[in-house]
Amino acid sequence: MKRIAIVGAGMAGLSALSALTKQGHVVTLFDKSRGSGGRMASKKVGDASWDMGAQFIRAHDASFMKTLHEWQHQGWVSEWAVTPHVIDAEGIRLSDDETTRYVGVSRMTALSRQLLAPATEFIPNTRIVSCQRTDSEWLLTDENDQHHGPFDSLIINTPPQQALPLLENSHLAAAINDVEMLPCWTLLLAFPERIDTPVDAAFVHDSAIAWLARNNSKPLRDSGETWVIQASHAWSQEQVDAPREEVLHALEQAFFTALGVQGYAVSEHWLHRWLYAVPAKPLDAGALFDADRAVAVCGDWCQRGTLEGAWLSGQQAASYF
């Protein structure tokens, strides 16, 4: 039995937690946010709520499909029976997409809370800023100069830019130094009435927007009319430091234009910038491991830029211990 620290409670970190606790290890998770889930984030403003990060889960890998079905049996996820539209210069039409999509119920963060349960300890609101390896143990220090540990092994589940300062004396730093992460501006809108459109989700082209979805079309969501609008990564990169009001206005207008509707009053809104949303080019390495220092690094950017990729990456990271 080992004492293992995981920095970052996103999907890959939760995946590693699942595997490690099944092996009997004692696992402590740290996260800079107040909760778990990373990009499985949800947001509530007034009476409105949204999944503001990852919109759904899908599976290509047989082992992950088995895991998804187990979660479904436990009531942690449910199928989102949606066929996305395509919106482009030719108009609005149904896509030929037949992918089965799943969502956490009653929000994406509900799944992360279930996956967090096996942790020996979860320490939120704690940003780890340095990790020191002695002869056989890890000691972690947070931004308030509080020390944590000792631990036998360490798993880092953060974007590569945030992992680098924690890997100063590991050869893994060179392996991830050039990994590029792309941003994504996300606008959340709520309306006092239902928008008259057959679209519940759509891939959008020729626009600042790449994806939009009627959040309340997902199973077991609040009934109020809520929409998630995700900008394209290229547009987000161009506008990465633009004033928030300008970004909000541009995405709101692009939303109405894409759906071909006007005259709907917005009752609530929220704008969020995901600075490290997805990898431009995943490493396709599964996870990275420094055996000499007993540290592994995982995340969707190590495998594939999806929740499935993050889960598989976490499983591989855990296998090293």
Residues covered by each model-derived region:
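Central helical "cap/lid" subdomain
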Residues: 37, 46, 147-200, 261-264
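N-terminal FAD cofactor-binding segment of flavoenzymes
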Residues: 42-85
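Glycine-rich FAD pyrophosphate-binding loop
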Residues: 21-45
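Flavin (FAD/FMN) cofactor-binding core of flavoprotein oxidoreductases
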Residues: 249, 256-293
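Short beta-strand to alpha-helix junction loop
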Residues: 56-60, 92-114, 241-247
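A conserved short coil-to-beta-strand element within the FAD-binding core of flavoproteins
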Residues: 124-138
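Active-site substrate-recognition segment that forms the wall
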Residues: 188-239, 246, 250-259
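N-terminal Rossmann-like FAD-binding beta1-loop-alpha1 element of flavoenzymes
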Residues: 2-30, 318-321
